[in-house]
Amino acid sequence: MPSTSEIILSANTHPGDSTTETVTGSNFKGDGYYGRSDGIHTVQYDYAGLTGSITIQATLATTPADADWFDVDTITVANLTEVKYANFTGNFVYIRAKLVYTDGTVNSVRLNH
């Protein structure tokens, strides 16, 4: 089956007032949704001047409530600009990104599976 690549969190720029902002992305289908057996997922984080954390959350629920989500990968940075990759494995039904930050810009978070 061909791999899928999609942006799960698009551009977000902090207003620059040092407040803590939280952005939770939409639900995106993971390998478990499609019945794939390998469960391999890769995310690409692309950010500039970011101070904060980006967490990838997953769920096994087909109609998830807030309590159904758990963390599978987190990066925490202080005033950093880079493109970074991470891999994780699991037959997750849905995946989403959660951004908590006090400065900077997230250009995108891309999911490949």
Q: Where would I find each of the regions flagged by the language model?
A:
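Residue-level recognition of well-ordered beta-strand positions that form the cores
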Residues: Q44-D46, Q57, K98-V100
